[in-house]
Amino acid sequence: MSDTNKYRIEVQPMPQFIPEQSDPENDRYIFAYTITIKNIGEVPAQLVSRHWIITDGNNEVQEVRGLGVVGKQPLLQPGESFQYTSGSSLTTAIGTMKGTYQMVAEDGTHFEAEIPEFVLASPRALH
């Protein structure tokens, strides 16, 4: 069993602009994102913490760290997925998010799961 396949987590983000909660005239843009986390490795692994890097359209960077996601620290068996929805607020109509989840495998090995960069954009920001 190679370590490359042993500790593997797939992360799929799906962002969405929330117009009814946004107020563009006051530089307030609200986004929701649904994240699917799947254990594609060979051992059970628990998500223990997160690290987000959020960049707005002015290249202002905000880093967010915390335990778990939405108050949970899910333990994922091989082949199992966990999905959650959360949100972010920007002062610009476009931005990006990326980061990592800190994971601990059942055997005590610590590893990171990459959250691929995704775009947060109000519909008019892309035209």
UniProtKB/Swiss-Prot annotation:
Signal peptide start and end residues: none
One GO term (biological process): error-free translesion synthesis
Gene3D superfamilies according to UniProt: ApaG domain
Residue ranges of every copy of the ApaG domain listed in the record: 3-127
PANTHER family named among the record's database cross-references: F-BOX ONLY PROTEIN 3 (PTHR14289), POLYMERASE DELTA-INTERACTING PROTEIN 2 (PTHR14289:SF16)
Name this protein carries in UniProt: Protein ApaG
Lineage: Bacteria, Pseudomonadati, Pseudomonadota, Betaproteobacteria, Rhodocyclales
Gene: apaG
